[in-house]
Amino acid sequence: MLNIVIFGAPGSGKGTQSERIVEKYGINHISTGDVLRAEIKNGTELGKTAKGYIDQGQLIPDELMIDILASVFDSFKDSKGVIFDGFPRTIAQAEALKKMLAERGQDVSVMLDLEVPEDELMVRLIKRGKDSGRADDNEETIKKRLHVYHSQTSPLIDWYKNEKKYQHINGLGTMDGIFADICEAVDKL
């Protein structure tokens, strides 16, 4: 089973490239945001618990997030694989994901890191904000999001390098060129 973690700052193209990976390799996409919204909408026990944290303005604990991801992952048992988008974000989450997968005889196949320089991310996100009207894509908020991303991710990149799962992907260039680099990395697995 192909288990991919896709990684990159806001605006790096994770969503676009995830869609293409899903289409080419016939694997399922797990976006933590989408999964949380679905669990809450469907009124599952996990969703109700998560909603309680969200309603109180609290972060969802890693253990609960892993339980939710495990439930979704298990629903894909006949799948060729999964791409994890938006998770893990911390070393504790990466360790929890590794444990959850190991309990199922699986492991992360590769962590794809879409690297884009910060000045280009700003240009992309400001354009996206204008095009989509997303309130969280204004310059001040973007800078905060990028700071949080960089402060959380440096240790995680090193963690995946130590696990021998890290793959750098240059996130500059055409969508097709970036996707070709991703395919080259995935096809080697």
UniProtKB/Swiss-Prot annotation:
Ranges that cross the membrane: none
GO CC list:
cytoplasm; cytosol
Q: Where in the cell is it found?
A: Cytoplasm
One Gene Ontology molecular-function label: nucleoside diphosphate kinase activity
Q: What does this protein do?
A: Catalyzes the reversible transfer of the terminal phosphate group between ATP and AMP. Plays an important role in cellular energy homeostasis and in adenine nucleotide metabolism.
Q: State the family it belongs to.
A: Belongs to the adenylate kinase family.
Record protein name field: Adenylate kinase
The encoding gene = adk
